[in-house]
Regions:
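Acidic/His- and Gly-rich active-site-bordering loop/insert found
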Residues: 51-152, 173-176, 395, 405
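Short terminal hydrophobic/aromatic SLiMs and anchors at protein ends
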Residues: 12, 17, 23, 31-34, ...
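Leucine-biased recognition of intrinsically disordered, low-complexity hydrophobic segments
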Residues: 2, 15-17, 48
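Fold-level recognition of mixed alpha/beta catalytic cores in primary-metabolism enzymes, strongest
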Residues: 146-149, 155, 159-265, 410-423
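Metal-dependent amide/peptide-bond hydrolase catalytic core
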Residues: 51, 100, 233-439
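Short, Lys/Arg-enriched N-terminal segments with co-localized hydrophobic residues
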Residues: 36-37, 44-57
């Protein structure tokens, strides 16, 4: 179905054709930090067109969301402009929080009474790359077959976003006593980076949401926790030389290999004697080396090597102690070498992090969302979410509950089943009813 809501948000942005950067990008007309939208662009009628064609609004929204290539390295502002227009058509005011480039933004919207804490539906709009994957369908288009919706982000997590936006539009027609909030972010896939400016905005607000449902894929089970993550880098400095005289140089890749051994040794210790939580697939904190770069060609002894690694920690894990152990291990490697190679070092730096989530299983938000879904128990998930930031920085009680499985995320031919989407729509319809009743 063709959507009359276009991809360029001209009501809020102007295309920069001036002789200065950012060239050819949409930039805010007023250059303000937050861009509000409460009136639709002229000649818009998307929701009405969907109703007339007997197509669910959710499916039409999902089709458009999947059509936007919002890989984290690319802008998402066209997608956000589309959503602002769609929400405005339903009479819903929304706010964009752009990044410094103007190419990416978070979106925040509220339906219902002002000045009352409500329920926040949270998701991200960015997706992981498709390069190098053997897709049999177009990744940036909706393909429906075998009772599944295919496309990059269908499971993680544009399927939930489409359901949440539909719920907001339908809720706008109802007399809510408790408001419904929508929070959509960028750059979640590269460290939950984008949502932090949205959290800054909420932190300064007089009233914060009462609770939050992060719609990451859990097969509609209610998840109360995930591990925290710290991304780190170790830069190994040796001394360059000709490979014919290799013993007279100091190979930085050898230093890196020794440091990887330190990481693996610490992982073995944590697995054997560290904290445990049997609710996770991997019941202990983990250390993982994901990337190693070094060397130019085979006949040059490299003087530099870089290791990117991570710690995924259980709640209560002393991660600073783990990092101290890593630094001590690095020092033990280089200390004996400094007399001959005083420049040698293994420098460890923290790149970014996000906190874990550990909502008590008897918390009000847990019981409330279980009552919406009919779930009896709870789970914890292996992947990270923005939920830990909402909890840690804003004190918002948070759970994770959304359609699909992360087993389908980040893979070629990513999909979410129609059955999972319908269960999510039913949960959100019940949520809207509860907001009308005041819970």
């Amino acid at each position: 179905m063709f959507c009359p809501i276009g991809c360029d948000p001209r009501g809020r942005y102007a295309l920069n054709l001036a002789g200065r950067p950012p060239f050819g990008k949409w930039v805010p007309r007023d250059k303000s930090c937050h861009i509000r939208r409460s009136q639709p662009s002229p000649s818009r009628g998307f929701a009405l067109a969907c109703a007339q064609q007997k197509e669910t609004l959710m499916r039409a929204i999902l089709e458009r969301l999947l059509s936007f290539d919002t890989v984290s390295s690319k802008p998402n502002i066209a997608l956000m402009g589309y959503l602002q227009d769609l929400l405005a058509e339903a009479g819903i005011d929304s706010t964009l929080i752009p990044d410094p480039s103007g190419g990416k933004a978070n979106l925040y919207a509220t339906v219902g009474p002002q000045g009352v804490p409500g329920v926040m539906l949270s998701g991200h709009t960015d997706v992981v790359p498709v390069e190098g994957q053997a897709w049999t369908v177009s990744p940036f288009a909706l393909t429906e077959k075998d009772a599944r919706y295919y496309g990059r982000g269908a499971a993680d997590m544009k399927g939930f976003a489409a359901c949440a936006i539909e719920a907001m539009v339908l809720a706008a027609k109802r007399p809510l006593k408790v408001p419904l909030h929508l929070a959509l972010s960028y750059d979640e896939e590269i460290g939950c980076m984008g949502v932090r400016s949205l959290i800054d905005m909420l932190e300064a607000a007089p009233i914060r949401p009462r609770m939050c449902i992060v719609g990451e894929p859990t097969a509609m089970q209610v998840a109360t926790g995930h591990k925290g993550k710290i991304a780190l880098r170790a830069t190994c400095v040796g001394r360059e030389g000709h490979s014919a005289l290799a013993p007279l140089a100091l190979n930085a890749l050898h230093l890196a290999a020794d440091f990887v051994g330190v990481v693996r040794g610490l992982q073995a210790r944590v697995a054997a004697t560290g904290l445990r939580d049997g609710d996770y697939d991997v019941p202990y904190s983990t250390l993982h080396v994901g990337k190693l770069n070094g060397g130019v060609q085979v006949n040059i002894v490299p003087n530099s090597a870089v290791i990117d690694f991570e710690i995924r920690s259980l709640a209560g894990e002393d991660t600073e102690a783990l990092i101290a152990d890593l630094r001590a291990g690095a020092e033990a490697i280089v200390a004996p070498l400094r007399a001959e190679f005083p420049e040698t070092e293994i420098r460890i730096e923290r790149l970014w992090d996000y906190p874990g989530l550990g909502t008590p299983s008897d918390a009000g938000v847990v019981n409330f969302v279980k009552s919406l879904t009919g779930a009896n128990g709870t789970i914890k998930v292996a992947f990270g979410t923005e939920g830990g930031l909402f909890d840690a920085r804003l004190g918002i009680p948070t759970v994770i509950c959304g359609p699909g499985s992360m087993a389908q995320g980040h893979k070629p031919d990513e999909f979410v089943s129609v059955e999972q989407i319908e269960r999510c729509r039913a949960m959100l319809a019940e949520l809207v009813d509860r907001c009308v009743a005041g819970f």
